[in-house]
Amino acid sequence: MATLHVLRVFCDEAGGFGNPLGVFLDGAEVPPERRQAVAHELGFSETVFVDDRSTAAMRIFTPGLELPFAGHPSVGTAWLLAHEGESVEVLRPPAGEVAVRREGERDDGLTFVSARAEWSPPWQLIEYDEPAAVAALDGPPGGREDEIYLWAWEDEAAGRVRSRCYSLADGVGEDEATGSAAIMLAEATGRELLIRQGEGSLLRARPLGDGWAEVGGGVVLAEVRDHPA
């Protein structure tokens, strides 16, 4: 059996909502050849396997494929390592080094990661005129199966955005909170953003220049349980 931490990443101010994430802090508990199957069994939009806690070397799997980088797994893993007492300032997924910073108390504050927008999956950013139209979606428009991120300004002057995200092809369906797409949107708009995605998750994102952007938010530990390796 392997120890699985289940987090909710990008929670709102009250600790609600957030995108579920599975993290195995000791990647050696799950053989590399089993990781894709384990991610499929769990069914989270992403599952993380930390291969070395001291260097924060990590791998990220959706139910259908491995990703070189993803936002909510990076934020969640950074938070969990800090929660477990690890002083990690950089994560190391396959895409490259991801800087970590924190605001506020260790568990109750906000966790941020910085990455290049080009590391993100190829989300298509589709702007809507009205946030109500985004909120009313009951699935990807036209039954599209590609990776789409639908968004509208709630308050453009204040940088407030309403969004939804779908990725049917890799088995995710609707993604409750998508850090990599938030990074792309911040880089594309050149704006500091507060994004309300899915049912009510909150993401904070801002461009850093030269193709880099930062995304962060609140994280809650939902449960710890054993899972067959």
Model segments located where?
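Active-site proximal loop and beta-alpha junction motif in alpha/beta enzyme cores
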Residues: 1-229
